Amino acid sequence: MVKGPGLYTEIGKKARDLLYKDHNSDQKFSITTFSPAGVAITSTGTKKGDLLLGDVAFQSRRKNITTDLKVCTDSTFLITATVDEAAPGLRSIFSFKVPDQNSGKVELQYLHEYAGISTSMGLTQNPTVNFSGVIGSNVLAVGTDVSFDTKSGNFTKINAGLSFTKEDLIASLTVNDKGDLLNASYYHIVNPLFNTAVGAEVSHKLSSKDSTITVGTQHSLDPLTSVKARVNSAGIASALIQHEWKPKSFFTISGEVDTKSIDKSAKVGLALALKP
């Protein structure tokens, strides 16, 4: 595997995962099984308030080609084909949704020791073209992420980011929404033995002068059980406990409360993921 700056989406990812991953206020259940031919079948059901959503996903691997098919309750089909290492460091992704005739997209990703590039284009008459690139190393990296609408001739997205990584910390700064939104994040490993880490994110919108500060932490109570907590400057506090009761199978309980309106009911989320 190439060690380098990675793709643009990885800038600030460690802090985002610590602060937001697995926190939810829904009830979610998923189970994965394997057919005799080796096809992975994952059934997922989610309850959002009074709304019930579900999908069934099929994944097949043949050498360096992975094919995914997802069938959703809204009668749509999402098909994705991924080809890894067609050339050293290159990944090709082709996807489309049925019956949406304008959903086709092709994406190319290339990872190098000193660069990470991703480009995608919609398979339509006037597609939107996206390009993201990162240069640097696994210590210091700088990159950009832009989208161009060929129909209007305008840039619909212009983002830029910077990341600094050491053994126990990662700091990043991104400028999004064409320079209107600034995000700074920090991730620090406090105790590797117990997977203890802290993270923080500061967001500032220049047009409205609104700022949000979010801080959080994670800690492993034992090799199979971990806890996470976060709070932001708006007074929203969240916490979760996750237990791996068998390999690759997780049970997660999460909660969220508005500390400025304690008369409101707390939001509680449950998630169960079963894998053989």
From Swiss-Prot:
Induction note: By the bacterial pathogen P.syringae pv. tomato.
Tissue localization of expression: Expressed in shoot meristems, root meristematic zone, lateral roots, leaves, stigma and anthers.
Traits of the deletion mutant: In vdac1-6 homozygous plants, normal growth, but small siliques and decreased pollen germination rate and tube length.
Function per UniProt: Forms a channel through the mitochondrial outer membrane that allows diffusion of small hydrophilic molecules. The channel adopts an open conformation at low or zero membrane potential and a closed conformation at potentials above 30-40 mV. The open state has a weak anion selectivity whereas the closed state is cation-selective. Involved in plant development at reproductive stage, is important for pollen development and may regulate hydrogen peroxide generation during disease resistance.
Protein origin, superkingdom: Eukaryota
Subcellular location: Mitochondrion outer membrane
Keywords on record: Ion transport, Membrane, Mitochondrion, Mitochondrion outer membrane, Plant defense, Porin, Transmembrane, Transmembrane beta strand, Transport
Species name: Arabidopsis thaliana
Gene symbol of the encoding locus: VDAC1
Gene Ontology CC entries for this record: chloroplast; chloroplast envelope; cytosol; mitochondrial outer membrane; mitochondrion; plant-type vacuole; plasma membrane; pore complex
InterPro entries noted in UniProt: Porin_dom_sf (IPR023614), Porin_Euk (IPR001925), Porin_Euk/Tom40 (IPR027246)
Similarity-based family: Belongs to the eukaryotic mitochondrial porin (TC 1.B.8.1) family.
Record flagged with keyword Transport: yes
Main location, first listed in the record: mitochondrion
GO molecular function annotation: porin activity; voltage-gated monoatomic anion channel activity
Domain comment, as recorded: Consists mainly of membrane-spanning sided beta-sheets.
Protein name according to UniProt: Mitochondrial outer membrane protein porin 1
Pfam families according to UniProt: Porin_3 (PF01459)
GO biological process entries: defense response; response to bacterium
